[in-house]
Amino acid sequence: MLDNKDIATPSRMRALLDKYGFNFKKSLGQNFLIDVNIINNIIDASDIDAQTGVIEIGPGMGSLTEQLARHAKRVLAFEIDQRLIPVLNDTLSPYDNVTVINEDILKANIKEAVENHLQDCEKIMVVANLPYYITTPILLNLMQQDIPIDGYVVMMQKEVGERLNAEVGSKAYGSLSIVVQYYTETSKVLTVPKSVFMPPPNVDSIVVKLMQRTEPLVTVDNEEAFFKLAKAAFAQRRKTINNNYQNYFKDGKQHKEVILQWLEQAGIDPRRRGETLSIQDFAKLYEEKKKFPQLEN
């Protein structure tokens, strides 16, 4: 085992790379944190205590994991790269509250793993430097499963983070904003420079905090259908919702008048663009659509 100096330093990271002859895989989005201050900011934002269970995705060499282990009751980490398992066994050997599962997070039975490893934790947080190429699928997969997650403090590509946290009417606001804000209250923690990673990524990064709502922001009877309807309004951002929905519905061009009636009954001006509609507006559209069986997709 190497000395137990913090992993998140350039010298310790290079020593680990040399010891294990490790080469970064670009296809896995491997950019490891080498700045303890950034990690401390993430830990602080996570409100982790001795009763918290943490899910981490992509622990890498354990930079963030070791700090999580020092603060949380238990850490459950999913690492897809088999080559990193012996490294993590080494770097995390001082901690008996960490479980590393060598699986793809998108294929793993997360609910079962949580029940097996975090069952005695009072709170569960997802805290991770997410692989940038699959950030959105990971978050949606976690949010849409029946897993008792209280919140997320996650690093991601700045552009994606801004979309999650976007306000109605902004350029970043879109269907992803709606899905994430339906489930969670979102806020920005900090912007992160490229220099705190090894190797530096090609994009800027951001840490966002997403706290699970006790109830979704609006009430709908079919979340999947609701999200599809909202997404259709952004199909071509420069077009009006009237145009986008004409293209979205089966025989929409033949039902122009019906679409206008539907929008009018929902109190939505057909000349508006999708980015100007709030989640509550989309919920009205979704409910009113039930009165118009001609509008199929």
Curated annotation (Swiss-Prot):
Subcellular compartments: Cytoplasm
Catalytic activity: adenosine(1518)/adenosine(1519) in 16S rRNA + 4 S-adenosyl-L-methionine = N(6)-dimethyladenosine(1518)/N(6)-dimethyladenosine(1519) in 16S rRNA + 4 S-adenosyl-L-homocysteine + 4 H(+)
Residues reported to bind S-adenosyl-L-methionine: 31, 33, 58, 79, 104, 129
Record InterPro entries: KsgA/Erm, rRNA_Ade_diMease-like_C, rRNA_Ade_Mease_Trfase_CS, rRNA_Ade_methylase_Trfase_N, rRNA_adenine_dimethylase, SAM-dependent_MTases_sf
Alphabetic keyword roster: Cytoplasm, Methyltransferase, RNA-binding, rRNA processing, S-adenosyl-L-methionine, Transferase
GO CC, alphabetical: cytosol
CDD domains: AdoMet_MTases
UniProt-listed Enzyme Commission number(s): 2.1.1.182
PROSITE patterns tied to this protein: RRNA_A_DIMETH, SAM_RNA_A_N6_MT
Class of the enzyme per the UniProt entry, highest EC level: transferase
Any Pfam family matching the protein: RrnaAD
The keyword rRNA processing is assigned to this record: yes
Keyword Repeat: no
Gene Ontology molecular function: any one: 16S rRNA (adenine(1518)-N(6)/adenine(1519)-N(6))-dimethyltransferase activity
Chief location category: cytoplasm
Described function: Specifically dimethylates two adjacent adenosines (A1518 and A1519) in the loop of a conserved hairpin near the 3'-end of 16S rRNA in the 30S particle. May play a critical role in biogenesis of 30S subunits.
Family: Belongs to the class I-like SAM-binding methyltransferase superfamily. rRNA adenine N(6)-methyltransferase family. RsmA subfamily.
Descriptive protein name: Ribosomal RNA small subunit methyltransferase A
Species in which this protein is naturally found: Staphylococcus aureus (strain bovine RF122 / ET3-1)
